[in-house]
């Protein structure tokens, strides 16, 4: 991984302050939902209304009256005023329309649960910008970008919906989210249990903080995915780093690397660490989107893309040049499966979305997730977790320093057994599962494991190629939601 422990993402078209420092594995959580065109529609467009609600910029202070418009989407085709429910998507780090169109599970179960679907956009993402074009100007404007403020937005929006939509006032609400949104769904149930009767937190790494889990668990799972997908695959990747180091020692070697990897720009010796970070991030992204069918989540990819990649990485005991030619073929599966890309751009994974800006600030304040590699239990170069280095980079970038223990102080870390009605789902292929809840905590804090699942596969729309493990997971999730809805109405009936 990176020599300075951080991957520099340059968004020079925005402004000088837009240079972002973010570790590849951590940025993957944010960039996972930020395609080049985040409002692109799926093959079958969803029918929803686009609405706006006036939110306070600061819910927890009393000397500011500034407000902004939070965007949210509503779909009520299958909603029933009698015995119905509200499924509330806790928006995360990106454009809410993209989330709406890519969370097919909610659309698939809406009729069965007689549900209204609500997708709430997270402040500072998409169109929900508290200070408009100045929202990312400096840390003073970004000061209100916190999970706590976002949860308060969700609470106020639910109150507004129940107050203004006839028939919604006395209906149960269930929070649903994936990845960071899954963390928010769980935290929302913890902090506002009177607002939602339960939460589905898919691929939510709520324990990827401080020392709650080993810092190397994420990259270890990435490595396991590659090791299981083809003979000698992870070993080939492990050996590629030294091959790159040796070949980049000379000008002719750099020139050869540029050609062999079909890069868009000539490599210099200063580019080598960035090149290795870019390659590392590619393997991370593949682990997260290792779906059982062809998909277009981050890039157009075949079914089980890691198996396809590993077909080119069967023999680690070859010359440096042949090994790296094989690495190119593997990279080409991710970046050029469509066959339309003429060269590979090692800055390509830095998307041009404001979502990346917001996430980099959150990673420098609250969402401080330790990652490390040792080159023994994983296929990456050794790299230790260095909080001071992160803190210094964050201060240089944003003028703020991280609070690594704040999330566990706010939400309890592993001491959450007093809460109820949260389903934590994780795919065993997903590297974020290492920071997730993978075992039942109580009868009502339940873990659902998807043996053939990558990153929140259960929230994707149903597919004929879905493995049995995800079909069972969705069935369990719906059963829990039905129980929460039934208990809500049973309790309401007893009170009258």
From Swiss-Prot:
It catalyses: Cleavage of a -Pro-|-Xaa bond to release a C-terminal amino acid. It is found in: Lysosome. It comes from the Eukaryota. Disulfide bonds join 215-372, 233-310, 264-343, 364-394. One of its GO terms (cellular component) is basal part of cell. Its main location: other. The active site is at residues 179, 430, 455. Glycans are attached at residues 47, 101, 317, 336, 345, 415. One of its GO terms (molecular function) is serine-type carboxypeptidase activity. The keyword Signal applies. Keywords: Carboxypeptidase, Disulfide bond, Glycoprotein, Hydrolase, Lysosome, Protease, Signal, Zymogen. Highest levels in placenta, lung and liver. Also present in heart, brain, pancreas and kidney. Residues 22-45 form a propeptide. Residues 1-21 form the signal peptide. One of its GO terms (biological process) is plasma kallikrein-kinin cascade. Residues 194-334 are annotated as: SKS domain. InterPro entries: AB_hydrolase_fold, Peptidase_S28, Ser_carbopepase_S28_SKS. The keyword Protease applies. Its EC number is 3.4.16.2. Cleaves C-terminal amino acids linked to proline in peptides such as angiotensin II, III and des-Arg9-bradykinin. This cleavage occurs at acidic pH, but enzymatic activity is retained with some substrates at neutral pH. Belongs to the peptidase S28 family. Homodimer. This is Lysosomal Pro-X carboxypeptidase. It comes from Homo sapiens.
